[in-house]
A protein has these predicted regions:
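Sec-dependent bacterial lipoprotein signal peptides
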Residues: 1-3
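Phosphate/dinucleotide-binding and metal-coordinating scaffold of catalytic cores
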Residues: 6-12, 163-649
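Extracellular and organelle-lumenal recognition/adhesion modules and their flexible linkers in secreted
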Residues: 6-164
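Extracellular beta-rich repeat passengers
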Residues: 93-95, 614-636, 641-643, 647-709, ...
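Short edge-strand/loop segments of extracellular domains
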Residues: 102-109, 422-426, 725-732
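Short strand-coil-strand connectors
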Residues: 105, 214-216, 293-295, 687, ...
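Short, surface-exposed charged micro-motifs
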Residues: 129, 221, 289, 419-421, ...
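Short, solvent-exposed aromatic-acidic interface loops
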Residues: 146-147, 224-228, 435-439, 741-745, ...
């Protein structure tokens, strides 16, 4: 077992001093309608039956006409009291289950549980725990049969506790302070949300507060978080928290905290941990003790929000995170809950594609360009377009869905819960797993395909996985991950490797949740793995027989003029397409199910003045197909105004989106298929010769690409070389390979191979630019992504872009090579492990060597004439540098953002600063450099930031004040 302290004795005895009542009752004795027990009588004695029993001779029989069992009341239940109930049941039909209910008489608090805690033969133990959120006159506990079949209940056991203790405040406690006037505002939102039974957008406004840590106060903004009242119903309400300015909390700029019960206690943590080990993007997720305004709230689940820190922590380069806007869905759900007439609307079809961090994305030219491709890709995914390998990372999605299958999760696969990261290097979407609500009761082992079966039956295109299933490569990837994850050995190894983390979490949860069935939750994953194992054959059959499906087009009911329903997010959509000659082109689409007429607009300069259009733009009520119309309006236009026919002349304002409608972008552009002629037996071999390409060349659908010694490849007219398979270039000293751009426009030599091994020997890359067209922006003249690569006796010269050589997410060796005369950095490696030896880097306008999030050894290298840093390690890099010389740099060796550099036998000359250690990004900690070779110590100025450390021999220097690093740079 992964647990050491969550056994029965622990649960019942740990808080024995707080137990005020303990009841047990079987069906052995009754008097009239009462079951007679030692402590207290239970109702429903007339239903005593000798048909079956868990113990003894009798049980309580329930059916449709007599659905209750072992009913008992508790009076004067005070806020904070805990009632825990356990009841055994046996069903006449295995698919029918009993519930154990604990509730007040007014359904202010109604806790229902039908999850299995234990089984003994045909009997199942159900448990439920109720923690009073207010004072109650009466609380009832009972077994409930909500089916049409007979269900037998027996052996009820109930514990009532006066309270549960809170964890003690420690250095790791998240301590929040919200000023009184701000807390009052938050409380008003909480009250209104509870009244309406849904947390609408109006109740999610931010208030100001502080996080108190280590004697400092970090300013933050907070708001209520969640959609339904499960996030609000207890005193442990959910919050979204954003740190302000140049601050972070434990490496996080924004995050959420929520009651662990809303996230399945340990279940969701377990899935997040598997994702981390499988290199799948997911939010960082943990448990933390929380204090708000001096009151200990107890254990919360803390989950990272969708910031660039999420990506960098998982070894991804910053890129847009996108989603389908779900506001229309919640407006629809609110109407369905509160209005008498249930009329559906096209929430999915009308959903707009949005980035997280809208302002940052809009202001950054690079992020804006990347978003346009991300938007195009997500629109293709939304519309189930063919060839998904062109717009999503198929392997990542296969892994994502297999992990969700292991967790028996379908909630995260709903369209409105999906979040995608646009990888700016591969130009494809990757899924981000979060919000993993599990179905513990119905373990199937293949949730994906049951969900798809439902969609195929209805033939409605709302299950986005169908786009993936069309691709045979996805199906192969998916089956391989089912094979890996659907293994009991995999789960057992995971439990062993994470035993310490699991126990630490359980120790925190045990304070407030003494009856939490932790082992049941952990055993759940082993059961799910077994289910996956048992259904592998049916998966093979399903994939083999999978065929295309023709979808039924949804037809939506048009609103009668008398029906004043209006859902603003499922109505008029206005998008800024472009700006030219002082006028903006605005695209308009209508999804409101009534005729509308666009009448006017307003501008930033005259926000209170409506300017009438020369003629209105009219749309008929939406039923199945939208049409797009356009307006040309002044450059400072901000809103358009329209009148829905069914609202009696009411004028509605719609803000114009900063983002255009999705375009159909293929980043590869018009590419040549010339390499197909060189394909034989799964290998593409370019024979020795001279080649000139004027449009992109793409190598794919093969085992590997070989370029023979003596070949010469000229990339002109912005042509780029793109390979999605490993590359093998084995030039010789007498017959090297030349890859160059005679007109300096060639869009780089780019290799994307997630798992393969590439070899570059005796190859000269000269005069290349980087890929920068069709909104695809790379930084390297040579870009190598994923897998592993061995580079020997190569040169990277005269590049026309940011990096001479850029290696990303790869394991590499590079020896006897040269990087020279670069426009910016010489060699840039991100999220790599590697060894660089006996190489020369010279004449770089910026850093000679720049490593981020990497573990690198640098041995016997010569660096000269660097425009900024000779060697730079950042974002938690670990560098070992030995027998290396740096002659000419602003900073010889720099360690940034929690990086650790070990330096031995290094010669520094002509450097303005010998060493620098500093923190540049708030989510990281201080940096350090340790110089151990005393014979080669160099005296000179150093840059040392607050709490960063430089050790030279036995002398340790620690920064005492915060440096203005940007200012120091600007003064060079």
């Amino acid at each position: 077992s992964a647990l050491s302290s969550c056994n029965d004795g622990y649960k019942t005895n740990a808080h024995s001093d707080l137990i005020v009542q303990r009841l047990t009752c079987s069906a052995e004795e009754n008097k009239g309608d009462l079951f007679l027990c030692h402590e207290k009588s239970f109702v429903n004695g007339l239903q005593r039956s000798a048909d079956y029993s868990h113990t003894g001779n009798y049980s309580c029989k329930t059916n449709k006409s007599a659905p209750y069992a072992f009913t008992v009341e508790f009076r004067n239940v005070k806020k904070g009291e805990l009632i825990h109930a356990e009841i055994w049941f046996k069903s006449a039909k295995p698919s029918k289950v009993g519930n154990v209910i604990i509730s007040d008489n007014k359904t202010v608090q109604y806790d229902s549980n039908c999850f299995t805690a234990k089984t003994e033969g045909e009997w199942t133990l159900m448990t439920n725990t109720f923690k009073a959120i207010k004072d109650y006159d009466v609380v009832k506990v009972y077994g409930l049969n909500s089916t049409n079949s007979d269900i037998y209940f027996d052996d009820a056991s109930i514990v009532r506790m006066s309270s549960t203790p809170k964890p003690p405040v420690t250095d790791s406690t998240l301590r929040i302070y919200i000023p009184p006037h701000q807390f009052s505002l938050l409380d008003s939102f909480l009250t209104e949300g509870r009244k309406e039974m849904i947390l609408r957008k109006e109740f999610k406004k931010y208030v100001k507060g502080f996080i108190l840590q280590k004697g400092d106060s970090t300013p933050v903004k907070l708001r209520l978080k969640g959609d339904w009242t499960d996030h609000l119903k207890t005193d442990k309400y959910s919050l979204r928290i954003k740190t302000s300015g140049n601050n972070a909390y434990n490496g996080l700029k924004s995050f959420s905290i929520q009651n662990p019960e809303t996230r399945g206690m340990m279940l969701e943590w377990y899935i997040h941990q598997i994702c981390a080990e499988e290199d799948l993007l997911t939010t960082r997720y943990d448990f933390v003790n929380v204090e708000i305004n001096g009151e200990i709230k107890g254990a919360y689940a803390l989950e990272e929000h969708f910031d660039k820190q999420l990506l960098e922590a998982r070894n991804r380069r910053e890129g847009p995170i996108v989603k389908l806007d779900e506001e229309g869905l919640w407006q629809l759900n609110y109407d369905l809950e509160t209005k008498p007439r249930k009329v559906l609307s096209p929430a999915f079809m009308s959903s707009t594609i949005l980035p997280f961090k809208k302002n940052r994305t809009h202001k950054s030219a690079t992020l804006h360009e990347q978003f346009l491709v991300a938007q195009s890709n997500l629109n293709k995914y939304k519309n189930l377009e063919s060839d998904p390998n062109n717009y999503v990372n198929l392997e990542a999605f296969a892994k994502y869905i297999a992990i969700l299958d292991l967790g028996n999760v379908d909630h995260a696969q709903a369209w409105h819960n999906q979040r995608q990261y646009y990888n700016p290097v591969t130009a494809k979407l990757e899924p981000i797993l979060y919000d993993c609500f599990q179905d513990k009761q119905h373990i199937t082992g293949r949730r994906l395909f049951y969900l798809v079966d439902e969609v195929l039956t209805e033939r409605r295109p709302t299950n986005l996985n169908l786009a993936l299933l069309r691709d045979v490569n996805f199906r192969d990837f998916y089956l391989s991950y089912i094979q890996k994850l659907g293994s009991v050995d995999y789960i057992k190894n995971f439990n062993e490797n994470n035993a310490a983390k699991i126990q630490s979490n359980l120790d925190l949860l045990a304070y407030e949740y003494p009856f939490y069935q932790a082992q049941v939750d952990l055993d759940f994953f082993e059961k799910s793995a077994r289910a996956m194992e048992s259904e592998k054959d049916s998966l093979l059959t399903f994939m083999k027989d999978f065929k295309e499906v023709t979808f039924v087009k949804d037809v939506w009911q048009k609103f009668p003029d008398t029906l004043d329903y209006f859902r603003p997010a499922i109505a008029l959509k206005a998008h800024l397409e472009n700006e030219e000659g002082g006028m903006k082109k605005i695209s308009l689409r209508n999804f409101h199910q009534s005729d509308i007429s666009v009448k006017a607009y307003s501008t930033d300069s005259l926000p209170d003045q409506l300017i009438l259009l020369d003629s209105s733009v009219d749309f008929t009520g939406f039923t199945s197909d939208y049409e797009t119309k356009h307006l040309f309006l002044p450059s400072d236009v901000k809103y358009v105004y329209y009148v829905p026919k069914n609202l009696g002349g009411k004028l509605i304002r719609e803000k114009i989106s900063k983002w255009p409608l999705p375009d159909n972008i293929d980043v590869r552009g018009d590419f040549s298929s010339v390499l197909n002629q060189y394909k034989k037996k799964g290998i593409i071999t370019i024979p020795k010769g001279t080649y000139s390409f004027t449009k992109n060349v793409v190598a794919t659908d093969a085992e590997k690409l070989i370029i023979e010694a003596g070949s010469s490849i000229d990339l002109t007219n912005t042509a780029g070389f793109i390979s999605y398979i490993p590359v093998e270039i084995k030039g010789t000293p007498k017959n090297p390979v030349h890859i160059f751009s005679s007109d300096s426009t060639g869009s780089g030599f780019n290799v994307f191979s997630e798992h393969g091994h590439s070899i570059l020997e005796n190859t000269h890359f000269t005069g290349l630019n980087s890929m920068n067209k069709n909104h695809w922006i790379l930084t390297g003249a040579v870009t190598l992504y994923g897998g592993s690569v061995a580079i020997a006796n190569c040169s990277f010269n005269d590049n026309q872009c940011e990096d001479g050589l850029n290696i990303i997410r790869s394991k590499f060796t590079m020896t006897e090579s040269t990087v020279s005369n670069t426009l910016s950095d010489g060699f840039d490696a991100d999220f790599c492990t590697g060894v660089l030896s006996n190489s020369v880097i010279t004449l770089t306008k910026n850093d000679a060597l720049d490593f981020s999030g990497s573990q690198i050894e640098i041995i016997g290298c010569e660096i000269s004439k660097a425009g900024d840093k000779g060697i730079s390690g950042g974002e938690n890099s670990q560098l070992k540098i030995s027998n290396t010389s740096i002659n000419g740099a602003v900073i010889g060796i720099a360690s940034k953002d929690y990086s650790q550099l070990e330096v031995t036998d290094v010669r520094l000359k002509n450097c303005d600063y010998t060493y620098a250690a500093f923190r540049k990004k708030p989510e990281y900690g201080p940096a350090s450099i340790t110089v151990t070779s005393s014979s080669e110590q160099v005296k000179g100025r150093m840059l040392l930031d607050l709490d960063s450390k430089i050790t030279i021999g036995s002398k340790v220097s620690v920064g005492k004040e915060k440096l203005d690093i940007e200012s120091l740079y600007s003064n060079q």
